[in-house]
Amino acid sequence: MSESTSKLDVNEVVKDQTEFMSSELPTPRYAWVALFATWLISIAIPMAWFALPGVASRLIPWMVASWVIPGQMTLDPGAAFGFLMNAIAWTAIIVAIPTGWIIRRIGPKPTLIISGIITAVGMAGVALFFNVSYETFLAFRVITGIGVGMCSVTGPTAVSLWFSNKHRFMAVAIWSTWVPVGMLFINNVSPALTSFMAGVDDLAGFLMNPANMAVATSQFQTVWWLITAIIVVALIVFIVLYRLPSIEKGEVSEISIERLDYKSAFPFLKNRQVVGLLIAWMLFEFVNFAFTTYDEAFLTAQFPEMWVGIEWMPAFLMTCGNACGILAPIGGWISDKLPWTKKWIIIFVGCFCLLLAVVFGWKVGAFYFFGFYLLFHIVGNVLLVGSVRPMVPFLVGRGGQTAVAVGLSILTVFQFGGECLETFVSYAIGAFASMDASAIGHVAVPPEAFQMTTWAVMLPIIAIGTAFALLTRPSKAEREAAKSPAPAPDWQPGEIDVPVDGTEVAEAPVQADEVIVEEEVDADDAPASRS
């Protein structure tokens, strides 16, 4: 497509969009090696994120004995633990956008290496200095959050560059299991490594003994040093195995590996489908995080007689619902099999399943209703985790590596933004529930009513998300263009295309002399072709 073209007919743009999305190049064999290396470091990093829940039943009493009783900490221990976990999400939101810029400057491999190093430093800092003070503990959790946030953007970018449209959804969906796999692994390993606490009824009293305190400290450190070691090993594997596709070897996908001006990505993001995808994903994260927060207590309150003697069962059932992101490759595989004009259906169905999950889970009157709730929760997770993140490079990939990185960085902001929004709402509901009856002007309301309020809030939230999922459907012009046989394509694989902006197409966002290369290249010597 000529760089001198300032305005193009919208039909020409739709045709190029159709050519990009309908292209099915063969995927290079080494792409699967690159995916493995990226996935390995990516599942190691969330282990640092979830380094605390597996030891929470021991860590919180330790915090009480070490900081609350001596008067060194005035925060409620449960709230203090929550801040340690939420620090990751808040930090990830802050670093997501700069990460897109960093990828544009140095590329995905160096950026992911930096992410791994920062996470390892944060985790090692926790292991070494967590007992100094709560503020020190929190500071190293923030450092860990920087690494997690960078990985959430860089990992799928590194994978997307290797895979063609034919396999990209499943490949990115495989990468998207990074959090469920890392979370499940460390949440099962941590209790085993801290099993010395088994059979101790009074944990706080146990920890009042200085000798026992030292034992507890060493056990926490064992878990956290293990996580640090796993990150380091995975990082070495990534450094050795991952590389960018080589055009000389014929390793070409539809997405160009050129790193362009940061602003060149923005026209590709001003797109109805992208906006619908972002909002639907944020509201899905809101509801899913609410499930994680409230489900166990809700289930126990609804059916207390069912869990006598099997207190672990509610938590196990909730784990099944929230860890089912491991099955995300199924959603990616289904998306790969669908025509490009039908891929949006997976996102819509996923949101609709979450809507049904809320309906069945809201004040259920029989346990079989919970079965339906759990089913729709799992199906919704599988479909959305397996399709939303891969959809970003599919929608903005014509802008090359830079557009993909920026798009995924914005998706990360919306993802963690949904979780933080849920935290605000839950705090607001909890504060309202804790008010004195005289302060709210009516008779005392049982706590279960406020628990139901949480579920009532989720219903309109996911309904709105389902409506926005409809916006990911291709336009009528694109659907019509996909039906008609096209002549020889103007767009070529790996080419940076001209962005769509309403009914007109603005001037191409970059010129040849704006392409970032490893060595200094004069503008007059820059190649005319972008492939």
Named regions from a protein language model:
Residues 165, 174-243:
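Helix-loop-helix hairpin linking two adjacent transmembrane segments in secondary transporters
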Residues 396-435:
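A late C-terminal transmembrane helix in Major Facilitator Superfamily
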Residues 94-108, 328-340:
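Helix-to-loop junctions at the C-terminal end of transmembrane segments
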Residues 140-178:
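Cytoplasmic helix-loop-helix junction between adjacent transmembrane helices
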Residues 8-14, 200-209, 241-263, 478-490:
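Flexible cytoplasmic inter-helical loops of multi-pass small-molecule transporters
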Residues 341-388:
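C-terminal transmembrane helical hairpin of 12-TM major facilitator-type secondary transporters
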Residues 52-57, 271-322, 326-329, 422-423:
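Extracytoplasmic gate region of multi-pass secondary transporters
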Residues 105-116, 336-350:
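Cytoplasmic membrane-interface "Motif A"-like loop-to-helix N-cap segments
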